A protein has these predicted regions:
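Catalytic, metal-anchored helix/loop core of enzyme active sites in primary metabolism
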Residues: 1-424
Length: 424
C-alpha cells in the first residue's frame, strides 16, 4: 500500500501560501457551502471559532440568500457562484445584510470561480461540491499545496490518475463517513498488515427485496431513505447502491487496496461506518451515530479531533447491530463498479456520468428503478476498454462524460417508449 492517497500515519504541512500563524484559528475555504456538507461544516465552524475561520465560500448559485447569510455570519473575504447569472442576486443579497461602512466580500462568478478559490491562501479546502464538476477544484487545491478535506468523491473517481499524479502523502483527508472510518481504523496497524477493508452499507430503503420486487419502485419510495438525509441524486444512489459502488472505487484509490480485498456488507443501523481486518484476524471498526458532522469535523481538524462534533453512541441503551451479505443479484451496481474501477482510465467517468443521467430519467418517470443500473451497464459496455495510465487528461474525462451522458439519455428515451423492463 505504498501508493495510498490518504495516509493516517502522516501529517501534511500546507504550502507557504497558508496565512495561519501560531495560535490563530485554522483558515478554511468551503466549496459547496449551501449544500448538505457545506451547511454542516459551517455549523461546526460557528461552534468552534477558536479553531476555525472561513476565508471564502462557493456555491452553485441557486440559493443566493443563504450564501449571503453565510458570508455575513462568517465575515468571509470572498464569495463565489458557479452561475454567472446569479452574481447580481448575490450582490444584492449581500448589500441587504451588510451595514453602512462594512466591507462587502469580493464576488467571483462563473464555472471557474470555485477552482480559483480552491487555490487561494488557506490551510484546508473542504470540497463539498456534488458531481464531477468538483474535479478541477480538487486538482487546484492539491497543486496549490492545500490540505484537501474531500467530500466530493466524484472528482477522485472520475479523475483518479490525475489526482494521484499531484497529491502528496497525507494531503487528502477523506470526509465520506465510510472512508473517514477506514482512515481512522487504519491507524491501528501497519499498511502491510491490512488484509481487507470492509465498507458498510445501510442497504437503503429496499433491503431484502428481490430484483423482481424492485422493478415497480417509484421515485417517491426511493427518495425515502431510512437513515440519512441527503439530496435527491445521492438518495437514489443509496437506494440502488451505486453510491456504495462509487465508494468502493474511492476506497481503492485512497488506500491502494485491490478490489478483491474490499468487501461490502449491509448494516441497516448505520452505526459501524466501516472496518479494517488485519492479517492477525483482528478487525477494527469505527462506530458513531449516523451524523455527517463527525467525519466533516475530523476532515477540518485532522490530526486533532473537534470536541463534541456530534453525539456519541449511547451505551446505556440496549441495541442490536445487524450485518448481512450484499445481494449482488438484486443490487448489481457494486460488482459493476468494481469492474469499472478495474478498467480504469475514463471508464469510471463514463459510469458516473451515465448514472447521473439515468437517475434523472428515473426521477422524471422515464426509467424503471432497475433500469438505472441496467442502462449504466449498457453504456459502460459500449464504451469498451479505455486507455489507461497517467496519460489521462481532464479533456479525456470531459469528452468521456459528454459521450456517456448523451448515450445514457438516448437509451433512457428508448426505454421510455417500450415496456418498463425492456432494454436496448
Amino acid at each position: 500500500m505504498t501508493d495510498s492517497l490518504a495516509h493516517p500515519h502522516l501529517r501534511f504541512e500546507p504550502a507557504a501560501g497558508d496565512p495561519d500563524g501560531p495560535g490563530r484559528p485554522r483558515s478554511l475555504v468551503i466549496l459547496g457551502s449551501t449544500g448538505s456538507i457545506g451547511t454542516q461544516a459551517i455549523d461546526i465552524v460557528l461552534r468552534n471559532p477558536d479553531r476555525f475561520r472561513v476565508t471564502a465560500l462557493s456555491a452553485a448559485g441557486g440559493r443566493t440568500e443563504l450564501l449571503a447569510e453565510q458570508a455575513h455570519r462568517l465575515r468571509v473575504d470572498t464569495v463565489a457562484v458557479a452561475r454567472a447569472d446569479a452574481a447580481p442576486a448575490l450582490r444584492a443579497a449581500l448589500a441587504d445584510r451588510y451595514g453602512p461602512g462594512e466591507k462587502l466580500p469580493e464576488v467571483l462568478a462563473g464555472p471557474d470561480a470555485a477552482t480559483e478559490l480552491a487555490a487561494s491562501p488557506c490551510h484546508t479546502v473542504l470540497n463539498g461540491i456534488t458531481g464531477s464538476i468538483g474535479l478541477a477544484p480538487t486538482l487546484a487545491a492539491l497543486k496549490a499545496g492545500r490540505v484537501l478535506a474531500l467530500a466530493n468523491k466524484e472528482s477522485l473517481i472520475v479523475g483518479g490518475p490525475l489526482v494521484k499524479a499531484v497529491a502528496r502523502p497525507g494531503q487528502i483527508i477523506p470526509v465520506d463517513s465510510e472512508h473517514s472510518a477506514l482512515f481512522q481504523a487504519l491507524t491501528g496497524g501497519d499498511r502491510a498488515e491490512v488484509r481487507k477493508l470492509v465498507v458498510t452499507a445501510s442497504g437503503g430503503p429496499f433491503r431484502g427485496r428481490t430484483r423482481d420486487e424492485l422493478a415497480g419502485v417509484t421515485p417517491e419510495q426511493a427518495l425515502a431513505h431510512p437513515t440519512w438525509s441527503m439530496g435527491p441524486v445521492v438518495t437514489i444512489n443509496s437506494a440502488t447502491l451505486v453510491n456504495k459502488g462509487l465508494e468502493v472505487i474511492e476506497a481503492h484509490l485512497l488506500f491502494d487496496v485491490p478490489f478483491d480485498a474490499i468487501e461490502v456488507v449491509v448494516h441497516p443501523q448505520s452505526f459501524i461506518h466501516s472496518m479494517v481486518e488485519f492479517t492477525d484476524g483482528s478487525t477494527l471498526a469505527q462506530a458513531s451515530p449516523p451524523d455527517m458532522r463527525m467525519p466533516i469535523a475530523l476532515g477540518l481538524g485532522w490530526p486533532d479531533r473537534v470536541p463534541d462534533a456530534a453525539p456519541g453512541v449511547d451505551w446505556t441503551t440496549a441495541q442490536s447491530w445487524e450485518f448481512f451479505p450484499l445481494d449482488a443479484e438484486a443490487f448489481p451496481s457494486v460488482p459493476l463498479a468494481c469492474h469499472v474501477g478495474s478498467l480504469g482510465g475514463t471508464a469510471p467517468a463514463v459510469f458516473n456520468a451515465a448514472n447521473e443521467e439515468c437517475v434523472d430519467a428515473f426521477l422524471k418517470g422515464g426509467l424503471p428503478f432497475t433500469g438505472i443500473v441496467d442502462t449504466v451497464a449498457d453504456v459502460v459496455a459500449e464504451h469498451g476498454t479505455p486507455a489507461r495510465g497517467t496519460s489521462l487528461t481532464v479533456a479525456d474525462v470531459l469528452e468521456a462524460e459528454t459521450w456517456a451522458r448523451a448515450r445514457a439519455r438516448e437509451l433512457a428515451a428508448r426505454a421510455a417508449r417500450t415496456p418498463s423492463e425492456a432494454r436496448a
